[in-house]
Regions:
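Short beta-strand edge/turn micro-motifs at domain boundaries
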Residues: 22, 178-180, 185-226
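Sec-dependent N-terminal signal peptides
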Residues: 4-13
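Surface-exposed, charged secondary-structure patches
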Residues: 108-184
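Core segments of small alpha/beta cavity-forming domains
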Residues: 30-138
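Sec/Tat signal peptide C-region and signal peptidase I cleavage site
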Residues: 14-18
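Short, flexible beta-strand-to-coil junctions
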Residues: 11, 81-88, 182-186
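Cleaved targeting-peptide boundary
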Residues: 19-25
Length: 227
């Protein structure tokens, strides 16, 4: 049965840095930032917060189409949500990854998550390569030593890469933006994510994001999971 869509957007300011809020069935999402495909600024930043990971594909799709997909930083933050949903439900997670990704990015993400989320006699649950907690590694406050327990609401902090925007030269048209997603799960805290915006669409897509699924530091203790 379809959930009731109880969404409301509340604009809390008029500038590009103004925070906006979106609600869906008791889950709250906010975004703030001035990252944009229209122009490059090395000082540009973005922040996304969320009280919960979307419960299912319906919520994820609504969030993307109506709110976070309209900004590069919102779209980049949604990849960690999609990775978590994939860990909970492979079919729904795959649909989420497909929804927000440039086609060539889908197999790259899914093939790695299958390995890192799966267990076998060669990769038991206590093996350092098995990293079900990987989606939490870019959430603010999550570190190996605290069991990758992030602060709440969950927060993804981003800033512009030193690499300027580029126009896609093959497989279509669009502006590719290079964004650093900050995370304490690796020695290199700046995790590069490429986001693309096509000229005929108001939505963004994740073009490439290997830094988000690269093996992070082994956890110390028990991962509590995400809400």
């Amino acid at each position: 049965m379809k959930q009731l869509l109880l969404a409301a957007v509340c604009l809390l300011g008029l500038t590009a840095q103004a925070q906006s809020t979106w609600n869906f069935n008791g889950h709250t999402y906010t975004q703030k930032g001035n990252l944009t495909a229209a122009s490059y600024s090395q000082k540009a930043t973005g922040v996304v917060t969320f009280t919960n990971v979307p419960s299912d594909y319906e919520e994820f799709e609504a969030l993307y189409l109506n709110f976070l997909g309209k900004t590069p930083h919102g779209t980049a933050a949604m990849m960690t949500m999609a990775m978590e949903i994939y860990g909970r439900n492979r079919d729904e997670g795959l649909r989420c990854i497909q929804l927000i990704s440039w086609p060539s990015n889908v197999n790259s993400v899914v093939s790695q998550l299958k390995e890192k989320y799966g267990t076998s006699q060669y990769a038991p649950a206590n093996d350092g390569y098995h990293q079900r907690y990987l989606p939490a590694a870019v959430l603010k406050g999550a570190k190996p030593e605290n069991g990758y327990t992030p602060q709440q609401p969950y927060t993804v902090e981003m800033k512009a890469s030193v690499n300027k925007h580029q126009e896609l030269q093959f497989s279509g048209t669009g502006t590719v933006m290079y964004i650093y997603v900050m995370g304490d799960g690796w020695d290199t805290h700046q995790r590069s994510v490429e986001v693309i915006k096509q000229p005929d669409s108001e939505l963004h897509q994740v073009f490439n994001c290997p830094s988000l699924y690269t093996q992070c530091k082994p956890i110390r203790g028990q991962w509590p999971g995400l809400k």
